[in-house]
A protein has these predicted regions:
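Bacterial Sec-dependent N-terminal signal peptides
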Residues: 1-22
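Sec/Tat signal peptide C-region and signal peptidase I cleavage site
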Residues: 10, 31-37
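Surface-exposed loop/turn motifs in large extracellular/passenger domains
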Residues: 37-63, 68-93, 99-118, 125-146, ...
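Bacterial N-terminal signal peptides
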Residues: 21-30
Length: 230
């Protein structure tokens, strides 16, 4: 806990709405010696709910969010935001969209030729549904932490992850939720490596059904592989 205290645990949990609480407690988090800035929306400072198109090829950030909703009066959904990370841009967390209270829908993260930190997430919510979010990792990219297509609470549905010619050092969860996880899909292609496990759907309290994992020739998953876990 000394490490967590030094890294300002409360501040970090607020930033990501509890999404990484388990990782923090497990001591997975690796932070730079100095806190970098967060990046929100098109201009880096606007917590917009929809329509963000963020493209970064340089700079050092603690977290990058396309869409972001952190109040109860936000729209019911944070939706249709896009984040693309290329070049030398460095960040611990990349999220197409995050909402503390509402749904996250149809958000996309693309990582191309880059090495990133702890979490890549198409869409994450602290209270509702994650629906039709997308993560694309390609072109010799490396993610040192976990990949989520959609991380919901009540449900996680129709999210997808595509990994090609890249390395993921932790687990891939295409759809994760306390409630039902349905119709999520991951494709691992073109000599990619996942050093832990791959789950199409992962439900803590509900059902997990109609989720798919496709691993093509030349790719390797070191840990467990399951279409759905409940």
């Amino acid at each position: 806990m000394k490490f967590l205290a030094k890294m300002k645990e409360k501040q970090m949990q607020r930033k990501i709405g509890g999404m990484l609480c388990g990782m923090l407690c497990a001591g997975v988090l690796v932070m730079p010696s100095a806190w970098a800035a967060d990046y929100y929306g098109n201009d880096g400072n606007t917590k917009q709910l929809t329509g963000a198109n963020v493209s970064l090829d340089s700079g050092n950030y603690d977290a990058v969010y396309g869409g972001y909703g952190d109040t109860e009066v936000s729209l019911p959904e944070v939706f249709k935001n896009n984040v693309t990370i290329t070049g030398t841009a460095a960040t611990n967390i990349v999220c197409g969209a995050y909402s503390f209270y509402g749904n996250v829908r149809e958000n996309t993260v693309t990582i191309s030729g880059n090495t990133l930190g702890n979490v890549v997430c198409g869409g994450g919510t602290g209270a509702a549904d994650a629906i039709k979010n997308h993560v694309i990792i390609k072109a010799n990219s490396e993610v040192n932490g976990i990949v989520y297509g959609g991380k919901g609470v009540t449900s996680s549905k129709e999210n997808d992850v595509t990994i090609s010619d890249s390395t993921i050092n932790k687990t891939v969860y295409v759809g994760e939720a306390d409630g039902n996880t349905e119709n999520n899909h991951v494709t691992i292609d073109a000599n990619s490596t996942v050093k832990e496990s791959v789950f199409g759907g992962y439900s803590f309290k509900g059902d997990s059904k109609n989720n798919e994992v496709t691993i093509n020739c030349g790719s390797v998953v070191t840990g467990n592989v399951a279409g759905g876990v409940a």
